């Protein structure tokens, strides 16, 4: 709702309240409307958050293009939302061809997203959904692909200048049977430890932090993923 409309609605509500009071004796009207714009309710609140991912626009039936006008409309809507934090998830496998990292593959989509965040000072949590980063059945991590993932984010931050990327989310919902980790904490932690080393080797120590597990938790029985990550991974996650 635009601020002007919100202000009008607030005034209308106050007028209705005062009108109701006017219909009664002054002694019976003790309602007080107070707006405190100075007190901070929660200092940890940083604002709205958005999930905004780049997707392939070719599904085998012709490529779909996003026009400049469409991008402008999207930007305008985001400006209205004023997000302070945006999660951007990709698949490293999408930028690897014939075993080599192809940094420019799909960049025309990703650049619009990161460009918006960089220009507006929005903090980005970049990440990989987890596909092929590990083999839960074999209990192994794909170090080659993790190397590519680290090199890719280092290129985005260093060469392309997207230092809005402050965090990295390795594997979506690792506690789930549907995830690449298949609920195996030790396997996920092994990948996190290795990847942290690769980020540091790429010069991202102190620049990009690995986040704890974005575990899908619907009850207290899965909360141990967070506490165990804190206890066992320490400063490898930030």
For each predicted feature, which ranges?
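Sec-dependent signal peptide recognition
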Residues: 4-12
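Active-site neighborhood of divalent metal-dependent phosphoester/pyrophosphate hydrolases
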Residues: 171-172
